Amino acid sequence: MERMLPFLALGLLVAGFCPAVLCHPNCPLDEENPTQENQDRGTHVDLGLASTNVDFAFSLYKQLVLKAPDKNVIFSPLSISTALAFLSLGAHNTTLTEILTGLRFNLTETSEAEIHQSFQHLLRTLNQSSDELQLSMGNAMFVEEQLSLLDRFMEDAKRLYGSEAFATDFQDSAAAKKLINDYVKNRTRGKITDLIKDLDSQTMMVLVNYIFFKAKWKMPFDPQDTHQSRFYLSKKKWVMVPMMSLHHLTTPYFRDEELSCTVVELKYTGNASALFILPDQDKMEEVEAMLLPETLKRWRDSLEFRRIDELYLPKFSISRAFNLENILLQLGIVEAFTSKADLSGITGARNLVVSQVVHKAVLDVFEEGTEASAATAVKITLLSALVDPMTIVRFNRPFLMIIVPTDTQNLLFISKVINPKQA
């Protein structure tokens, strides 16, 4: 009979919001200046990371949609993957392999060191200051006061993931919960509140990842043009929503006849853009089934600047919270949640097991721009109606929205908007 050891719970929390203020991390990722050789090597690794993260993002999206097909979806795949990569710093053997392969890394082509290096470089890139775009991403550890962590883990957590560390009294669960929730609320400018609802009585450590994004449209909508209009939930059912509009704009556009959808890219000031995918009526499931890295690449490669006479987009604010344990099991990350978990790289002992993975995201889309946080899937719907010689695009039925920083090509947020009035 297997002897059961007392296990200590470890929580993994992910939060995200997208506002227009640039956050400056309190803890720099690396004080040293990277050499040209490291930069060149990092570029190669970063391209691989972007491709891998897109694969993970769409795999995760499909699982989230299966869980609640009739609800809005918003999450930050990059925030979730970063949190799991951060966790893998302390994992060994099968636990480590499952986490990294679950993130869609090919471990015969990419070493563990290269994976962490690419996340380090990505965090450094995303946290660079800009007057036009506010984007910050960071990590933190909340550690039971009596728990002793390995120096190597602490050093790598700070060097590679810029993690802050906070001594926490988890015996006082109310105070610990407030400490963590206040931290996340502060880092997301008040947009993510009450990330933690409950703490396991055996919790000894909580890892947190947050992302904050706020950007202004390169071509903003005029609030005076916003009016109440129908958003179709189905052919016969609709809700009235505030509908923003733009007239006579030239922007990247692609009509995908193969998948029966229209793709429009709206750019933010700074290095980011939002990709809106509007399936034809009753074609959403077909488009979702083909959400693959190669599909996204084909869309982006096919975009061409086109004059759009009228574009209509709903103004909305949506949020979702997810417990990701069961979904991660479907993606092959299993052992970390069981008594077989090997997270001995954190404390030196095999007495830690992941008890919960919580993700919460908020997305606001309005006339001036977009706000979103941490694990956020951006939802904006696109509907195309062509009236020769005019091009009119109406996001007045369910659509997808993807926010991408142009300098990394990783997916910050993915959103599916089923109902703009569904908070």
From Swiss-Prot:
Residues bearing glycans: N93, N106, N127, N186, N271
PROSITE patterns per the UniProt record, alphabetical: SERPIN
Reactive bond, annotated site positions: L383, S384
Gene Ontology MF term list: serine-type endopeptidase inhibitor activity
Role of this protein: Although its physiological function is unclear, it can inhibit neutrophil cathepsin G and mast cell chymase, both of which can convert angiotensin-1 to the active angiotensin-2.
Quaternary structure, from the entry: Interacts with DNAJC1.
Tissues where the protein occurs: Plasma.
Keyword Secreted: yes
InterPro entries: Serpin_CS, Serpin_dom, Serpin_fam, Serpin_sf, Serpin_sf_1, Serpin_sf_2
Compartmental location: Secreted
Region (RCL): 369-394
Transmembrane domains' residue ranges: none
Ranges in a coiled coil: none
Signal peptide: 1-23
Gene Ontology terms: cellular component: extracellular space
Organism: Pongo abelii
Pfam families: Serpin (PF00079)
Keywords: Acute phase, Glycoprotein, Protease inhibitor, Secreted, Serine protease inhibitor, Signal
BP GO annotations: acute-phase response
Family to which this protein belongs: Belongs to the serpin family.
Domain notes: The reactive center loop (RCL) extends out from the body of the protein and directs binding to the target protease. The protease cleaves the serpin at the reactive site within the RCL, establishing a covalent linkage between the carboxyl group of the serpin reactive site and the serine hydroxyl of the protease. The resulting inactive serpin-protease complex is highly stable.
Keyword Glycoprotein: yes
Name of the protein: Alpha-1-antichymotrypsin
